[in-house]
């Protein structure tokens, strides 16, 4: 398939104001309400993260979570956008309205809080999942040794969908490997797969291989990295890794708001190493028939634009979208641009 490349404007939203002063006041009030809603959402996400950090009991390992919007009622497609513009009528005809959001390494469902609110405001149905050993899933990350174990909450969510229901699967960073794994297993359940600065690997490739330019080869990383965790003791192979906070700030959040960095610093958890080092088996008959889309982040220091471009060349998706000014976490640094792209992909026939 040929690639389509769409480059989002650096400014998330452009509001055109006419000569009507009253309209300008309404827009300003709308903007203030949007900021207040976002602040409220952030407080709720922060509260959940603090609660997570204090949890001492263990929960069932297959937990999926939803972080609701600030609205007291569920939005519909006929509701207005936050800028007082009517939602396009063609959204009413969308056959697939459920988005399953899959976080990347160290993150959890909490990282999608802005995306969840925006999708719900548009009348869509976002669902998040905590992968094994991540977010509110209290599985010990040191015990997660395979991609199958890591992806189990996502696989169970897809397996429990109604027979005729399909979803749009969205993966961030190494969550892209889980998306690929799910696409190989359930191509009939996944309408579209969206990779956000993600590890869109080829058959026989490891998720870690995508980061080799930044972190060195897997073999070198396993021998020399200071970020490795030895959950079973130094005499046994490493079980996970975790970047230092200052390292993460510069690597992941170079364009993100301070409040989202603070949320991440108390929420991120160690990353299971086994799934990152596992080679994926992807077939042309199943994975190859899936509809894949890639979102590039052009100010990304964790997965450079050059590496993302290489991924697109080697594993060609149906279309490519680019977000200017976004770091490795566009759901924090450019949430409105990301939202527009998700809507646009949902509307592609």
UniProtKB/Swiss-Prot annotation:
Primary localization: plastid
GO biological process: jasmonic acid metabolic process; salicylic acid metabolic process
Function: Putative methylesterase.
Molecular function terms from GO: methyl indole-3-acetate esterase activity; methyl jasmonate esterase activity; methyl salicylate esterase activity
Gene name of the encoded protein: MES12
Gene Ontology CC terms: chloroplast
Protein name: Putative methylesterase 12, chloroplastic
InterPro entries: AB_hydrolase_1, AB_hydrolase_fold, MES/HNL
UniProt-annotated location(s): Plastid, Chloroplast
Pfam family, one: Abhydrolase_6
Transit peptide: 1-77
Superkingdom classification of source: Eukaryota
Chloroplast keyword on record: yes
Active-site residues, as the UniProt record annotates them: 173 (acyl-ester intermediate), 300 (charge relay system), 328 (charge relay system)
EC number annotated for this UniProt entry: 3.1.1.-
Keywords, sorted A to Z: Chloroplast, Hydrolase, Plastid, Transit peptide
Protein family: Belongs to the AB hydrolase superfamily. Methylesterase family.
Organism: Arabidopsis thaliana
């Amino acid at each position: 398939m040929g690639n389509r490349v769409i480059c989002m404007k650096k400014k998330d939203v452009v509001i055109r104001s006419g000569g009507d002063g009253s309209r300008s006041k309404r827009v300003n009030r709308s903007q203030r309400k949007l900021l207040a809603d976002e602040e409220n959402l952030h407080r709720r996400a922060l509260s959940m993260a603090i609660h997570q950090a204090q949890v001492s009991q263990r929960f069932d390992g297959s937990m999926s979570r939803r972080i609701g919007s600030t609205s007291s009622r569920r939005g519909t497609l006929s509701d207005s956008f936050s800028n007082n513009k009517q939602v396009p009528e063609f959204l009413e005809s969308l056959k697939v309205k459920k988005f399953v959001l899959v976080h990347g390494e160290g993150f959890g469902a909490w990282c999608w809080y802005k995306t969840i609110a925006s999708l719900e405001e548009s009348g869509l149905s976002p669902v998040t999942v905590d992968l094994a050993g991540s977010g509110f899933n209290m599985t010990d990350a040191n015990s997660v040794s395979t991609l199958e174990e890591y992806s189990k909450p996502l696989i169970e969510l897809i397996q429990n969908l109604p027979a005729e229901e399909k979803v749009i699967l969205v993966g961030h960073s190494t969550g892209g490997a889980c998306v690929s794994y799910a696409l190989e297993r359930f191509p009939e359940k996944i309408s579209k797969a969206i990779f956000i600065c993600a590890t869109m690997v080829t058959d026989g490739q490891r998720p870690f291989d995508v980061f080799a330019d930044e972190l060195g080869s897997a073999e070198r990383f396993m021998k020399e990295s200071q970020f490795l965790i030895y959950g079973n003791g130094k005499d046994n192979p490493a079980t996970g890794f975790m970047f230092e906070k200052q390292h993460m700030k510069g690597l992941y959040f170079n364009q993100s708001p301070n409040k989202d960095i603070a949320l991440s610093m108390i929420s991120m958890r160690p990353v299971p190493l086994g799934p990152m080092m596992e080679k994926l088996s992807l077939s042309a008959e199943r994975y190859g028939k899936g509809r894949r889309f890639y979102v590039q982040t052009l100010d990304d220091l964790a997965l450079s634009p050059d590496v993302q471009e290489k991924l697109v060349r080697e594993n060609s998706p149906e279309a490519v979208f680019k977000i200017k000014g976004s770091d490795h976490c566009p759901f924090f640094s450019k949430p409105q641009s990301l939202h527009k792209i998700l809507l646009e992909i949902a509307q592609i026939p």
